[in-house]
Amino acid sequence: MTLIHMNIIMAFSMSLVGLLMYRSHLMSALLCLEGMMLSLFVLAALTILNSHFTLANMMPIILLVFAACEAAIGLALLVTISNTYGTDYVQNLNLLQC
């Protein structure tokens, strides 16, 4: 495993730890998810370039499309939650709350 791969895996792990630690606010959770998706994109692109697997060239682009959709839905949810409740706490997403 090269140093580049280890750095990308460490970036993914740090984003995952950030998601687990700072999950009280929706904005910080969205930023950590974006970091995870970006590191997965770079890892997929490097893996495809190193293995010369031409059939999977579109996989990183598809991953970026899903990341953009996730970001758009997350930001729309953030705007809705902050307009409704006035805060961006993740605990406001619980539908069973009275």
From Swiss-Prot:
It catalyses: a ubiquinone + NADH + 5 H(+)(in) = a ubiquinol + NAD(+) + 4 H(+)(out). It is a multi-pass membrane protein. InterPro entries: NADH_UbQ_OxRdtase_chain4L/K, NUOK/Mnh_C1-like. Its EC number is 7.1.1.2. Gene3D superfamilies: 1.10.287.3510. It comes from the Eukaryota. It is found in: Mitochondrion inner membrane. Pfam families: Oxidored_q2 (PF00420). Core subunit of respiratory chain NADH dehydrogenase (Complex I) which is composed of 45 different subunits. PANTHER family: NADH-UBIQUINONE OXIDOREDUCTASE CHAIN 4L, NADH-UBIQUINONE OXIDOREDUCTASE SUBUNIT ND4L. Core subunit of the mitochondrial membrane respiratory chain NADH dehydrogenase (Complex I) which catalyzes electron transfer from NADH through the respiratory chain, using ubiquinone as an electron acceptor. Part of the enzyme membrane arm which is embedded in the lipid bilayer and involved in proton translocation. This is NADH-ubiquinone oxidoreductase chain 4L.
